[in-house]
A protein has these predicted regions:
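Core catalytic lobe of class I
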Residues: 1-260
Length: 260
C-alpha cells in the first residue's frame, strides 16, 4: 500500500509533516494531510493568518429530521455558520478560495422550501467575493421528502445541491485548463473539418477560430456526480479500522476544486 494511503497513528513516532502549520495534535495523518478531532473553530484558531490556499467544507445541513451528528435549525443557521466564516476569512490567503457545499431543506409540515442557504450566501458575500456558484446534480438521490414526492406526488425529486465558490479577492488562484473535459463528437468534427463562420439566431458571431484545439472543453458549473460507490476507498478504510462512516461529499466533487 502506498505511503500516502496509509493511516499513520501519531503513537508510531513518525514525524507529522504538517506540524509547522498547526500546533494541535492530529488524530491521525497521512502524507496527504492530517485529521483533527475537536471543535473546528477552536482548532482553526491555531492556524496562522493568511496561510491556507483552499478550504472545502460541507457543513451539516439545516434538515428537519436531525442526523445523529447534529444539525442547526434553519432559523439559527446563518449566525451559527458566521462563527466559522470569520475564521475561514482569517486563515485564507489573499488569492485563496473557500468552497461550501450546502444542501437545501424543506419547511416543516409544508411542501415549501427554506431559503436558509440563500440567506447564508447573502451574508457571506458581505465578507467574501462570490466567485461563482456551482450546482451539484446527483442522479442517484432518493425521491425525498417522501410525503411530497412519492405519497402526495406534489413535488419532484430534489437532486441538486449548491456549491458556492468564495474568495477574498475578485481574482483567486484558478485555471480552468486544469479541469478540461473531453470534446464532444460534434466539436471533434469541427476541429477536424472546420466550421462555416456565421451569425447564430442568438446574435453571436461564430468565427473560424472557434475550431482551435484547446486540448479539451471548458466544463460548465453544473456537476453531474453520483455518490453511490459502495466499494470506495473511504468505505473500505472505515470498515478496515471499524469506523462508522458518515455522510460525505463526492470525492469527484472535491477534485474539481483541488485541481482548479
Amino acid at each position: 500500500m502506498p505511503f500516502y494511503d496509509t493511516v499513520l497513528p501519531i503513537d508510531l513516532g513518525i514525524e507529522n509533516p504538517f506540524e509547522s502549520l498547526i500546533s494541535a495534535k492530529p488524530y491521525y495523518f497521512t502524507e496527504r494531510g492530517s485529521a483533527y478531532l475537536g471543535d473546528a473553530k477552536e482548532i482553526m484558531k491555531q492556524i496562522p493568518d493568511s496561510s491556507i490556499n483552499l478550504i472545502v467544507t460541507s457543513p451539516p445541513y439545516a434538515l428537519v429530521f436531525k442526523k445523529e451528528y447534529g444539525n442547526v435549525d434553519a432559523q439559527d443557521y446563518v449566525q451559527w455558520f458566521l462563527g466559522f466564516a470569520n475564521e475561514f476569512h482569517r486563515v485564507l490567503k489573499e488569492d485563496g478560495s473557500l468552497v461550501i457545499n450546502i444542501g437545501g431543506t424543506w419547511n416543516k409540515g409544508t411542501p415549501t422550501r427554506s431559503t436558509y442557504q440563500f440567506e447564508l450566501i447573502i451574508e457571506l458575500a458581505k465578507m467574501f467575493n462570490l466567485a461563482q456558484e456551482f450546482y451539484w446534480y446527483n442522479p442517484a438521490r432518493l425521491p425525498a421528502p417522501a410525503e411530497w414526492v412519492t405519497v402526495r406526488r406534489v413535488r419532484v425529486k430534489d437532486a441538486v445541491e449548491l456549491v458556492i465558490w468564495l474568495s477574498k479577492t475578485p481574482f483567486p488562484k484558478a485555471d480552468n485548463r486544469r479541469v478540461l473535459q473531453p470534446y464532444s463528437k460534434d466539436m471533434q468534427r469541427i476541429i477536424e473539418k472546420g466550421y462555416v463562420a456565421k451569425k447564430r439566431p442568438s446574435g453571436h458571431n461564430i468565427m473560424n477560430k472557434f475550431r482551435k484545439d484547446n486540448n479539451g472543453a471548458i466544463p460548465p458549473n453544473v456537476l453531474q456526480i453520483g455518490n453511490t460507490d459502495s466499494s470506495s476507498q473511504y468505505l473500505q478504510k472505515c470498515n478496515e479500522y471499524s469506523i462508522k462512516p458518515t455522510s460525505r461529499t463526492s470525492l469527484s466533487l472535491d477534485i474539481v476544486f483541488f485541481t482548479s
